[in-house]
Amino acid sequence: MKINILTLFPEMFDIFKHSIIGRARENGFLHIETVNIRDYTLNKHKKVDDYPYGGGAGMVMTPQPIVDAIKAVKEKNKGKVIFLGPRGKTFNQEMAKELSKEEELIFVCGHYEGIDQRIYKYFDLEISLGDFVLTGGEMACIPVIDSISRLVPGVLGSEESFQDESYYDGTLEYPQYTRPFEFEGEKVPEVLISGHHENIRKWRRKESLLITKERRPDMFEKIKLSKEDIKLLKSK
């Protein structure tokens, strides 16, 4: 997958040079490039923002630099243009799955008080992280790209790595334990050291369902429970 990020702060995405995403880039599974919107401004002072018509606090990003940057990237990349902003659809795992199937994606990060309304017609999709305010689109773009990237084949090395994670199948993940067996008087559940893989699978599924029911009843209501799920929930 190829990802282009249009931003005023390319250095903020250096985080993708490290860890799993960094290795995926080195191995050719991901190609991430940043484009500095400021490089496309025609203003001799390199300004990319101006005062809003009608008055108001803050500055608004002007249309020319962003639109020209989008057009330049689109000449070589045919991916969807995605804007990170409060009006967008709330991002979730299902959206991450769908976007991970794309070969190319183009992200546009806004800043200041927002962007000129005339830019919006260039976006194929608008995404929001939720009902809260961030300093800029970069802050939202990083977790969105990370979530999408880890679903791209080859990035995690094994599909099983993300299939057991929270949200993948509509449930929260089951509890995890590691050494030592006993810590501050609390022991690891016996089933996890039994070596009985089927019992371990059932325990994990039951715990996942119970945690989801308790912590996220809104998610639990959407789960299509199997006969086994119902039996597990009724068991002691």
Curated annotation (Swiss-Prot):
Record's function text: Specifically methylates guanosine-37 in various tRNAs.
An annotated GO BP: tRNA N1-guanine methylation
Assigned keywords, A-Z: Cytoplasm, Methyltransferase, S-adenosyl-L-methionine, Transferase, tRNA processing
Subcellular location: Cytoplasm
Name the UniProt record assigns to this protein: tRNA (guanine-N(1)-)-methyltransferase
Family (UniProt): Belongs to the RNA methyltransferase TrmD family.
Known EC number: 2.1.1.228
Classification via Pfam families: tRNA_m1G_MT (PF01746)
Keyword S-adenosyl-L-methionine applies: yes
Catalytic activity line of the entry: guanosine(37) in tRNA + S-adenosyl-L-methionine = N(1)-methylguanosine(37) in tRNA + S-adenosyl-L-homocysteine + H(+)
EC supergroup of this enzyme: transferase
Binding partners and assembly: Homodimer.
Main location: cytoplasm
InterPro entries per UniProt: Alpha/beta_knot_MTases (IPR029028), tRNA_m1G_MeTrfase_C_sf (IPR023148), tRNA_m1G_MeTrfase_TrmD (IPR002649), tRNA_m1G_MTases_N (IPR029026), tRNA_MeTrfase_TRMD/TRM10 (IPR016009)
Species of the source: Clostridium perfringens (strain SM101 / Type A)
Disulfide bonds: none
GO molecular function list: tRNA (guanine(37)-N1)-methyltransferase activity
Positions that bind S-adenosyl-L-methionine: 110, 129-134
Recorded GO CC terms: cytosol
